[in-house]
Curated annotation (Swiss-Prot):
Coiled coil: none annotated. Residues 77-91 have a biased composition (Basic and acidic residues). This is Putative membrane protein insertion efficiency factor. Belongs to the UPF0161 family. It comes from Hydrogenovibrio crunogenus (strain DSM 25203 / XCL-2).
């Protein structure tokens, strides 16, 4: 794994193992913000993953009802490829 990813993931794992059990469940979302952060960094890399995590943590407050909020899929590997026919139709 990329060493820069570990710089993000290790503090989150520390939080999950040692701090979260003391504080108790507080996250309003599933997966929790800490799990979301790890998954986002693993899927999208350090910069995009960290940005997604920051946006998610900013939404986790008493004014937001929470709910299921999975990590979005990466937009760089689109399933829909543009065919030559579509290109000529758009021209």
């Amino acid at each position: 794994m990329n060493p820069f990813k570990w710089l993000i993931i290790l503090p989150v794992r520390f939080y999950q193992l040692f701090i979260s059990p003391i504080l108790g469940p507080r996250c309003r979302f599933y997966p929790t913000c800490s799990h979301y952060t790890i998954e986002a960094v693993q899927q999208h890399g350090v910069f995009c993953g960290l940005w997604l995590a920051i946006k998610r943590i900013a939404k986790c407050h008493p004014g937001n009802p929470g709910g299921v909020d999975p990590v979005p899929s990466c937009g760089c590997h689109s399933d829909k490829e543009t065919t030559p026919k579509e290109k000529s139709d758009n021209a």
